[in-house]
From Swiss-Prot:
One of its GO terms (biological process) is establishment or maintenance of cell polarity. Keywords: ATP-binding, Cytoplasm, Kinase, Nucleotide-binding, Phosphoprotein, Serine/threonine-protein kinase, Transferase. Its main location: cytoplasm. Residues 334-352, 415-426, 540-567 have a biased composition (Low complexity). It is found in: Cytoplasm. GO terms for cellular component: actin cortical patch; cell division site; cytoplasm; cytosol; mitotic actomyosin contractile ring; mitotic spindle pole body; new mitotic spindle pole body. This is Serine/threonine-protein kinase nak1.
Amino acid sequence: MENNTASSPYTKLELVGRGSYGAVYRGICNLTKETVAIKILNLDTDEDEVSDIQKEVAVLSELKQSDVENIIKYHGSYLVGTNLWIIMDYCHGGSVRTLMEAGPISEPCISLILRETLQALKFIHHAGIIHRDIKAANILVSMSGNVKLCDFGVAAELNINRRKRITFIGTPYWMAPEVIRDGQEYNVMADIWSLGITAYEIATGSPPHAKEDPFRAVYLIAHTAPPRLNGNFSALLKEFIASCLQDVPQRRLDSSELLKSKFIKQYSRMSISELTNVVKRYDTWQAAGGIPQTLLLGEEADDGSDPDQETSDTAASDDGWEFGTIKQGQSNVSSITGTSTSTTTAATSSTTVTGTVIPKSSTVHEPPSSNDSHPLLQLFKDSKISDDDSPSNAEGASTEDSKGEVSYSQIELPSLDSSNLSSKKSTIQSKHTKQAEDYDLFVGRTRSNSKTSSDQSIKRPLPRVVQRQKTSLGKRGISMSPMKPGLRMPSSFDLQSRSISMGAFEQLSTPLEAPAHKHSAVLQPLEVNRSISIPPPKSISPSILHKPSLESASSTPKISSCSSTPKPFNSKLRAHLPPLSIGSPAVQPLANDNYDSLGVRGLNMELFNDYPGNMHNIKSVLSLEIDIVLGEMDACLKSLECNLLNRKAYNE
């Protein structure tokens, strides 16, 4: 155990995992005695790299506020000299990759792991985050069976320029084809491809092309058909992986759709407590003498190559916190046990005691000289950092000064805004002046400046919910700011934009440019003078028999004509009624006032006095009013037809 002072909020214990960019230790909160995981990153680097770290920690802060169950909980960040301590939840079960060493994982448990991972991906994708490193080593399982997604691109943000190319070469096995292809952008669907490779990895024990050289794997992923799961597996699992591994991104199912897939729904009633059996099986296997590959190899080979051909002197533990993403990264990143100014190195020996790795000794290096102009201090100068911060060794161990104390400074990062990314935007916009990249949604980093590559494929249109997110594009397309859509206004407020069908109920003698509420000539209700028991004539004049028109009906009002005849209004209700049978010689007797007719009320033109901005409400109310009037007109016509038939029968 490291001898920390009383001022330190956390006590760092044994090493539980190591990557090319940092290390993870088990720790204890001195206040609550809670077991936590401490990820230590060396920040003694350039200013732009520190800015990337600040942005990523700000993303973790946003995730902390959301308190999502399937995402590793972030407790805070502390500056210890030139080291950044990221405090997270500790998962005793380790990663899924480590649990696979005790034996194959059954399909029901695979479904549970994928279901919980999809819940996490659904949240971060809707929040505007691309994980970019989905694999079994980044999916943790707690002792109670809870699945946690971890490692949200801190290592990827640290790797810029030269290191970015190394990351690309070292970990191609989980990458989507659009990520590998030169000059092609990608979005959240790259994570869906990686999830399909992860499902393949859990089922078979290794990702596709695991035995190939990384350069060969890059070529195969970009130029061959997507891999398919073969062997003694269920058809539902094969279908799930095939729906993820589509070469064209827009053909892949998103996280919400995958949660509704048959393979996930088949085991939807299973509890996550079933995964505790997988953790217990691993503990039993280890107690029986099983040695994890992380103990044999140090850093686990994430590229899936044969472990017998790999050598490493990096120590790690059996808890399975494998965060390494670069196969040959030790030569490019400062060692976690020394700083950039150190000239001496010390090998850390370790012994296995009850499944944990406890360092015996470590060489304490001289701390670098204090420099107030360090980019780290300049970047976080607005944060609440105490003035007595002093650098320590790169491992985060307590380098005691003359008083034997080390300073801890909690970082309270500001939220992401445009000022944090102003320098990056200017660089990107100078390269891509023809594209409004600040509004491209969820676009990943561009592997090349060339935008005319023949290998580019069609971009997937993002889901409707995702399209509401506004991306403030930096180097790698991470955003957390939702976009507020503008107020939707009608395209025009003049009468020309209205339906011409209104002309069937309005007098069109007034010019069309006049305001709608000033139309006063309306089709008046059909007024019928009713009389009682007036017998119809028993004989009909021959001249009347050949005149089926209604011109002699004095009760029918005349409508003023217009230069342009309005189109008839085709009512939906009229389309469902049988055709009228009025055009017969018996029409003339019905032209008098001797039949009972239903009243038809006029259209309320006061609806047009409302503000034009409420056009949507006016349209709804007007549609209802028109349907009511048409219904009354149809009833009136049916009554007229019935009277006609009765009169015809009476005459006969």
